[in-house]
Amino acid sequence: MDRKPIIYQLLPRLFTNTNNHCIPGGTYQQNGSGKMNDITDTVLSGIKELGATHVWYTGVIEHATKTDYSAEGITPDNPHVVKGQAGSPYAIKDYYDIDPDLAVDVKNRMRE
């Protein structure tokens, strides 16, 4: 590489969220979430056109949340350890899993 790397930090929860009327402190049901599937080749090409050489995905790792995915075997966390409703992407629960909010198909979230 002949030039310095330029890193584009991308928070999928916000970057690809199509809800234009998010409520501060709102729930997943109220605000929704961007999805990993929405980060397409076109999106990545657009980031590259900005001059970025790398993408740093933030908030992808499973973190504490109040969202209930019990049907998929993921129970909500104790509200005392969750920041707001959506949780902080820095409150990591499992370094080897993906945040289910970012998946279209929660059971297959690792493939997305």
What is each of the regions a protein language model found here?
Residues 1-112:
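Acidic/aromatic-lined carbohydrate-recognition and catalytic surfaces
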